């Protein structure tokens, strides 16, 4: 694996150096600690299948340049498993469901940030992974995935129905998209 990375790195040195100029910044040290493979991301399919290596580097550079420029004070918290608490979701008595914004390494190809509904055990009940980028000079939020409960969650279909009831008819999937739009 290391040999492949070194060969690819040598072959695409200029592009990887472009990426490192952004993610190598001291303010992004928490990112590198949480996701040491960040530099490898453009070497594989990322965000959409047709993106070239140069486009993948640009997507990552734009995302992290935006975060560094606008939200540098939040970076350390974004790259922790706890992330930033955005709110809570209606839950049954004695239960807590958190809405969290964070960098989740599970979404290696789908996006650099995610909004997730998490139960008390920290299991993802629903997630939306995305990147912040620019298109024709206009900032855009690109959603890479919307995912339901992770495999460890018991009875996922029943859970989604319960979450929809608790949310007064608002489906978790719709909530994730609405929250992403609010962040944009």
What are the residue ranges of the model-derived segments?
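Terminal substrate-recognition subdomain of acyl/acetyltransferases
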Residues: 1-112, 119-126, 134-139, 148, ...
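Acyl-donor binding region in acyl/amide transferases
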Residues: 127, 133-184
């Amino acid at each position: 694996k290391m040999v492949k990375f070194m060969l690819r790195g040598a072959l695409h040195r200029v592009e990887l150096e472009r990426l490192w100029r952004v993610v190598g910044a001291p303010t992004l040290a928490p990112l590198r600690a949480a996701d040491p493979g960040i530099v490898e991301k453009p070497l594989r399919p990322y965000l959409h299948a047709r993106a070239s290596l140069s486009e993948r580097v640009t997507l990552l550079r734009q995302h992290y340049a935006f975060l560094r420029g606008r939200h540098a004070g939040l970076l350390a918290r974004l790259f922790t498993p706890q992330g930033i608490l955005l709110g809570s979701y209606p839950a049954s008595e004695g239960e807590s469901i958190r809405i969290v914004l964070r960098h989740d390494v599970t979404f290696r190809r789908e996006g650099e940030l995610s909004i997730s509904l998490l139960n008390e055990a920290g299991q993802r009940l629903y997630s939306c992974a995305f990147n912040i980028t620019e298109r024709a000079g206009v900032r855009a939020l690109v959603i890479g995935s919307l995912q339901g409960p992770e495999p460890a969650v018991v009875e996922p279909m029943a859970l989604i129905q319960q979450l929809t009831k608790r949310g007064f008819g608002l489906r978790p999937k719709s909530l994730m998209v609405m929250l992403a739009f609010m962040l944009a």
